[in-house]
């Protein structure tokens, strides 16, 4: 796996649409955060003076006709060959090609990446994979004990489990009343 930044040609004025469509396609095809990581199109805020002297704040593209994609273009099964992610980017409506030769995109140099990320106010950082999902054997109606936080050592009944957020809602008896408390999975035990 070789994750690099690439400049992608687009039709001028289509940068926003290309960015949205590309991220949508990456998510739908299961490539987001595995093959296609980020799509950027640096902008700057400017003040334009219109007729009559009225000042208007506008966003202006720093690189009209380009978006920048952080991705792995190689085929996992054939190192050195271009993979499906390359086809996904090239096949996105509004994309006219990669910067490079007709058969091989050329990645940006580290200096170019640093300038690009600085222009959008992001420090260059290595890609961090998503944290693994925590699997917890909890369901509504389970009796649990709170192990940490302000309700430590209280017991309660699980009323709701939110697995994507790794949260659980527990009904804790406080002063004789059932009070819902939202906790992280790590704060409760059966």
From Swiss-Prot:
Keyword Transmembrane helix among record annotations: no
Q: Which residues form the signal peptide?
A: none
Q: KOW domain location, by residue?
A: 141-165
Please indicate which superkingdom the organism of origin belongs to: Bacteria
Q: One Pfam match, by short name?
A: NusG
| Alphabetical keyword list | Transcription, Transcription antitermination, Transcription regulation, Transcription termination
Q: Which GO terms describe its biological process?
A: DNA-templated transcription termination; regulation of DNA-templated transcription elongation; transcription antitermination; transcription elongation-coupled chromatin remodeling
Q: CDD domains, from UniProt?
A: KOW_NusG, NGN_Bact_1
Keyword Transcription regulation applies: yes
- What Gene3D superfamilies is this protein classified in? 2.30.30.30, NusG, N-terminal domain
The record's Gene Ontology cellular component field reads: cytosol
Q: What does this protein do?
A: Participates in transcription elongation, termination and antitermination.
What family does the database annotate? Belongs to the NusG family.
- The identity of this protein, by name, is Transcription termination/antitermination protein NusG
Organism for this UniProt entry: Deinococcus radiodurans (strain ATCC 13939 / DSM 20539 / JCM 16871 / CCUG 27074 / LMG 4051 / NBRC 15346 / NCIMB 9279 / VKM B-1422 / R1)
Q: What is the lineage of its organism?
A: Bacteria, Thermotogati, Deinococcota, Deinococci, Deinococcales
UniProt lists the gene as nusG
């Amino acid at each position: 796996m070789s994750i690099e930044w690439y400049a992608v040609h687009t039709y001028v004025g289509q940068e926003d649409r290309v960015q949205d469509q590309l991220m949508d396609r990456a998510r739908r095809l299961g490539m987001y955060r595995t093959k296609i990581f980020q799509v950027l199109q640096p902008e700057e805020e400017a003040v334009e003076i219109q007729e009559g002297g009225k000042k208007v704040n506008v966003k202006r593209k720093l690189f009209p006709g380009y978006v920048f994609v952080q991705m792995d273009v190689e085929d996992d099964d054939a190192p050195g060959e271009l993979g499906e992610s390359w086809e996904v980017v090239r096949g996105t409506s509004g994309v006219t090609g990669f910067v490079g030769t007709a058969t091989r995109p050329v990645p940006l140099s580290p200096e170019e990446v640093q300038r690009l990320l600085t222009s959008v106010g992001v420090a260059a950082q290595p890609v961090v994979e998503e944290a693994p999902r925590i699997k917890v054997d909890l369901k509504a109606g389970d009796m649990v004990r709170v192990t940490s936080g302000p309700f430590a050592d209280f017991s309660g009944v699980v009323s709701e489990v939110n697995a994507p957020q790794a949260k659980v809602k527990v009904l804790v008896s406080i002063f004789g009343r059932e009070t819902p408390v939202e906790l992280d999975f790590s704060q409760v035990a059966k």
